[in-house]
Amino acid sequence: VYDDPVGGEPTPRQYRIRNMRDLARFVHKDALHQAYFNAALLLIQWGAPLDEGNPYNALYKRQRGFATLGGPHILTQVSEVASRALKAVWRQKWLVHRRLRPEAYGGLMQMQKLGYEGAKREYGLPDWVFETAAAKAVRGRPSGTYFLPMAFTSGGPVHPAYGAGHAAVAGACATMLKAWFKDDEPLQGRIQAAVHPDTLRPLDVLQPKETPDDDLPAYGGSDAAQMTVGGELNKIACNVAMGRSMGGVHWRTDNTRSLRLGEQVATIMLKRQSKDYAEKPFRLSYRSFDGLLVTVENGAVKVPGDPALEAFYAQ
């Protein structure tokens, strides 16, 4: 929810994220794992069931997890895996790929094709790049240049584009939450029953009340009952990752590959921890971004649908 700026000054009116510019604004100003920490708090508040392999869900019926396998534990897990994912992706950025930001590539296109004050410079860019729909759309703006329009006033970050920090953290945190909670649990009933923690008034998230100032219409899709914990966590991860592209600072593959890098970081972290719990048996499962069932148990990772990925985790 953001202030609605009028004349550069914030006003009391607030609104939900509603378009690509709003989403780009969020991923420019957020704390990196903010969306998933908030999601964890909501899942805990809504009483989302734990994964069936959590001992406190299936075995210890008269106890609840706390410091281990409980609420405080998952909150620290989300924070810890975010840090680990960042370290992994920063190595890829600086020591492996060093990929140009889209903004910088637009600058190369400008200097090769149009130049500056009549002076051009050859960078070896192929002719077809200038004939793409995207290049023509950018050139067709009033400025008439190939400089990329940016949603971020500060422009692109000065570190390389591939992989994407936001996407790696998104993949890691979403995977941690999908493994921790029952990811195929339907969400509609829990969302409809949600109340504000202070006022206890209904939040009306799924079917907001129609008011003159409400810019979010009621959801009319027939698939409302099919929304699940895992599906909504995937949606958050995708929105945050792609929101950086909407800001103009990433290529699509920066995000799609880094989501999977984060997924692997989280899975390896769970694998290493799974041998240390006193509570037995311990097993966590989730659906990967590719729709594969992944199970972590006793220091091993099983991926029946992808033997190569299972072999990777066995290293």
Which residues are covered by each model-predicted region?
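Hydrophobic alpha-helical bundle signature of multipass membrane enzymes
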Residues: V1-Q315
